[in-house]
Amino acid sequence: METDLNDYTVIKEGEAEILMHKKNQVFFNKAQVNNRDMSIAVLREFLSKRKQEHEAKSSKRTRPASKVIEKDASEASKEETPSENGMNNGDHEVASEDGPSSVSKDPAKTTERFAPREPKPPKVLEALSASGLRALRYAREIEGIGQVVALDNDLASVEACQRNIKFNGSVAISKVESHHTDARVHMLTHPKEFDVVDLDPYGSPSIFLDSAIQSVTDGGLLMCTATDMAVLCGGNGEVCYSKYGSYPLRAKYCHEMALRILLASIESHANRYKRYIVPVLSVQMDFYVRVFVRVYTSASAMKNTPLKLSYVYQCIGCDSFHLQPVGRSLPKNNSVRYLPAIGPVVKQDCNHCGKKYNMGGPIWSAPMHDPEWVTSILNSVKSMKDRYPAYDRISAVLTTVSEELLDVPLFLSLHNLCATLKCISPSAAMFRSAVINANYRISGTHVNPLGMKTDAPMEVIWDIMRCWVKNHPIKAQSPEQPGSVILSKEPSHEVDFSRHIGSLSKAQAKKVARFLPNPEKHWGPKLRAGRQITSKHVSLIGHEAVNGHLSQHHEELKEEDEEAEPEDNVQDKVDPKRQKTATDNITST
């Protein structure tokens, strides 16, 4: 049965094209182009790293073979050399004929035995494919990609995906396959089969993590998105704990904490199968968080997990926070002993303002990025800018990520520090200079343009702010306010606000854009597929926010209502509020 293209709109992104039905039958979100572009960039880097690792392993395997070849060749050359006593021509000819032939055969056999095999093209699983746009872009844009398996539990989505596969031609047909099945069941029944697993659900990925971890090959790549930011950022802490096993805190760093909660949850699922993760890139963009981690199997390396997790103590009165590691290691002879961490790291009351602490976590406190990966991905993206529809955005995010302090979890907000003290804010460059002049490190964060990552302790941070307030006095406040308690103490560190050359990052010095506005209105999450689109949705969140298409049924109803209603009736209509006000005025008169 042929598809009537009049009922569809062709949407092109990158090199892929999909047919989108006007009745919102299958989910599609234009804003996720950033997500898809970033995934393609990371996947390209994964293929490159995978090839390098394979070549390195192959070279190690071929070294013994080369030594054997050299040894056989040297022995053969000795046999070929005539002795001083002399040899007859017949014997010499036989030796010369047999020697080289035997030498030439053995190395050939040895070389064949240790010949490096080319790695198989990576097999990719898109667990929740919907329209199949992501799978189609992987197949058409990434060189060397293998089979792409697209799954969905919704029959309409599978039919749409299959329709789009045919619409994209022979390359898509040969590489992409679509199945109507539960992604969890499929991943559980295909353990360690996929080199890449992509989870991009509508909401939380928590129910897919256990099966996804099992389906990734050793050294494979797991890409995971979470869009339930209200839960991850502390809006519903008990729900977050039930889904991810961590309790979130409502603070300025909540979006980075969301990333670290997701990483900790993935690590927890991996540990159940003697596996562990190595994050290569973790980003927060738009309305979601996205992590890219490699999955490895090692019972011994898995023991380091408690060293990578921490609880967070957040003061309820000021911006002070402290991290409490879950475990610690103690070297003993040639082995390592793992012990519980020593704590607590804070007193019951805050040392700075005297208020209590909230405790959250555990979160992933190890690095969220691999700097080598980030630099390589950024360079690759810049060299192929024409192939990324969202180049400006992803290059800006990667640039900021490349300048972050990797070993500093969470961050401070300069505006929040000033809000606590109720003082005017110093410039970011001045504050950074003061931290650097105190022999500490500081950087920005891709999560928040006002955020600052630093390894300076909170005592130094508050001393900097105390000295700033001394030079810029404020009005008297209630002595019970956290800001008053902090300012009542004298600084214990010398503060130097003189401009430091490192107060601006390389990107800032070159005036490279790092934080970009949304490209259009209503740039965010869209309606779930299958929901009835009404004129109310359009009036509230805009025409484009409902995938850019109103159903013909609603358009026809709207036109009929407008035609059925005479213009005189529209003019005679009175707002009930205005009518009531007018009646009250007449009564009062």
Curated annotation (Swiss-Prot):
Binding-site list for S-adenosyl-L-methionine: R36, R134, D152, V185
EC number(s) given by UniProt: 2.1.1.216
Keyword Magnesium (UniProt): no
Regions that span the bilayer: none
GO biological process terms on file: methylation; tRNA modification
Keyword Manganese: no
Compositionally biased spans, kind Acidic residues: 558-569
Residues in Trm1 methyltransferase domain copies: 9-465
Function: Dimethylates a single guanine residue at position 26 of most tRNAs using S-adenosyl-L-methionine as donor of the methyl groups.
Reactions catalysed according to its record: guanosine(26) in tRNA + 2 S-adenosyl-L-methionine = N(2)-dimethylguanosine(26) in tRNA + 2 S-adenosyl-L-homocysteine + 2 H(+)
Classification via InterPro entries: SAM-dependent_MTases_sf (IPR029063), Trm1 (IPR002905), tRNA_met_Trm1_C (IPR042296)
Record keywords, A-Z: Metal-binding, Methyltransferase, RNA-binding, S-adenosyl-L-methionine, Transferase, tRNA processing, tRNA-binding, Zinc
PROSITE patterns: SAM_MT_TRM1
Compositional bias of kind Basic and acidic residues: 68-81, 106-122
Superkingdom, natural source: Eukaryota
Leading EC class: transferase
Family assignment from sequence similarity: Belongs to the class I-like SAM-binding methyltransferase superfamily. Trm1 family.
NCBIfam families: TRM1 (TIGR00308)
Protein name: tRNA (guanine(26)-N(2))-dimethyltransferase 2
Name of one Pfam family that matches: TRM
Molecular-function annotations in GO: tRNA (guanine(26)-N2)-dimethyltransferase activity; tRNA binding
Binding-site residues, Zn(2+): C315, C318, C350, C353
Annotated region described as Disordered, given as residue ranges: 51-122, 550-589
Annotated phenotype, changing D200A: Loss of activity
